[in-house]
Amino acid sequence: MFKVLPFTAIVHPNAITAPRLVVKMSAIATKNAVESFVVKPPAHPTYDLKGVIQLALSEDAGDIGDVTCKATIPIDMESEAHFLAKEDGIVAGIALAEMIFAEVDPSLKMEWSINDGDKVHKGLKFGKVQGKAHSIVIAERVVLNFMQRMSGIATLTKAMADAAHPATILETRKTAPGLRLVDKWAVLIGGGKNHRMGLFDMVMIKDNHISAAGGVSKALNSVDQYLEQNKLQMGVEVETRTIAEVHEVLEYASQTKTSLTRIMLDNMVVPLSNGDIEVSMLEEAVDLINGRFETEASGNVTLETVHKIGQTGVTYISSGALTHSVKALDISLKIDTELALEVGRRTKRA
């Protein structure tokens, strides 16, 4: 299941001199691990979680590894560290943490009292990792970086998904570069749904496409021709910004066989000076479409406004705030000091 390969970018905790080795899971082992997840990560055609993990470990390790660990921690010291929630929220990233620990040192053992997507309260110890102190400390920051970000996304997603009901909450492509898989996975864990993964899995006709094509109808017609010529089948969404554009889309669809599946209603939620929002334009657009296509509200979506937007009858509500500026959930990983000291004393006596 496992094989040892040379990998110069990642430093194994026990490797002090070159060549450095890292234990890597086989493709079958990776697939089996993913299948066991409570919430499975979304798929991507050109990269996967292994690549994300290896890049994160590589940028941390540099070319010689953790010099502080080598200087301060006996290489054979065994220890135990606990995950502590320092504020209330939804935890996400447990499955990814296990993959990271396994990448650093497959001998590490983990135990959890919760699953991805569960709520934690401040002060709760919800997991522990046991094994070589070197390995735990080397993996610590990478694990926490992912878990804190993912948990922050999942926490906000859960709150917005609950408030948006019966509409479904979606994220956007406004994700951290290189972390789209992870960010979108966190949205799923928090109870949201994924919008398109990238530029390749859905046609999304936005304002710039419409301007370049010469109008909404021309853009839609070009997309229909392109998909037919290339024998492609995928979702098609078009952005509308006014009621007139909604009429134009519906007129086009009534006269032409189209691949259109969803109409985005962009910035049809108007913020008011008193902090409330006006949704009459959005309601009018939803009534016009009358279930012929999926609808997606976008723009001025916050935790405070999403409930009112969700009551208009839209199918989806998309929010870039879920991923582009989310607050990380405060989580720590602390080594059991007494256990470490006792192991250290035994090591010295030996």
UniProtKB/Swiss-Prot annotation:
Pfam families linked: QRPTase_C (PF01729), QRPTase_N (PF02749)
Binding site for substrate: R141, T172, R173, K174, R196, K206, E239, D266, S298, G299, N300, S319, G320, A321
Protein name: Quinolinate phosphoribosyltransferase [decarboxylating] 1b
InterPro entries with a match to the protein in the record: Aldolase_TIM, NadC, NadC/ModD, Nicotinate_pribotase-like_C, Quinolinate_PRibosylTase_N_sf, Quinolinate_PRibosylTrfase_C, Quinolinate_PRibosylTrfase_N
Family recorded in the similarity comment: Belongs to the NadC/ModD family.
GO BP of this protein: alkaloid metabolic process; NAD biosynthetic process; nicotine biosynthetic process; quinolinate catabolic process
Alphabetized SUPFAM superfamilies for the sequence: Nicotinate/Quinolinate PRTase C-terminal domain-like (SSF51690), Nicotinate/Quinolinate PRTase N-terminal domain-like (SSF54675)
Keywords of the record: Alkaloid metabolism, Glycosyltransferase, Pyridine nucleotide biosynthesis, Transferase
